[in-house]
């Protein structure tokens, strides 16, 4: 009987430890997922080069403006 009680206590401790660990995981997963770029953002990066690249129209620079042939912030 004592062995059963000890076994149940150990199981309860392990389950509570697992619950605490699982509560922390979603936050880490959210951080990881928020850093990932969507396919649309990746495509936009390919179409719109670095802001130091030359441009002739504002839309070529994505969210930047085109001034004197270069993207400005």
Curated annotation (Swiss-Prot):
Pfam families: Conotoxin (PF02950)
Positions carrying 4-hydroxyproline: 49, 54
Sample GO molecular function, one term: ion channel inhibitor activity
Disulfide pattern: 48-62, 55-66, 61-71
Residue numbers of 6'-bromotryptophan PTMs: 64
Keyword Disulfide bond set for record: yes
Signal peptide stretch: 1-19
Cellular compartment(s): Secreted
InterPro entries per record: Conotoxin
Domain of life: Eukaryota
Predominant subcellular localization, coarse grouping: secreted
Residues the record lists as 4-carboxyglutamate modifications: 53, 60
Proregion residues excised on maturation: 20-44
The entry's keywords: Bromination, Cleavage on pair of basic residues, Disulfide bond, Gamma-carboxyglutamic acid, Hydroxylation, Knottin, Neurotoxin, Secreted, Signal, Toxin
Expression across tissues: Expressed by the venom duct.
GO cellular component labels: extracellular region
Family membership noted in the UniProt record: Belongs to the conotoxin O2 superfamily.
Free-text comment on this protein's domains from its UniProt entry: The presence of a 'disulfide through disulfide knot' structurally defines this protein as a knottin.
Protein name, entry field: Conotoxin Gla(3)-TxVI
Species assigned in the record: Conus textile (Cloth-of-gold cone)
Lineage of producing organism: Eukaryota, Metazoa, Spiralia, Lophotrochozoa, Mollusca
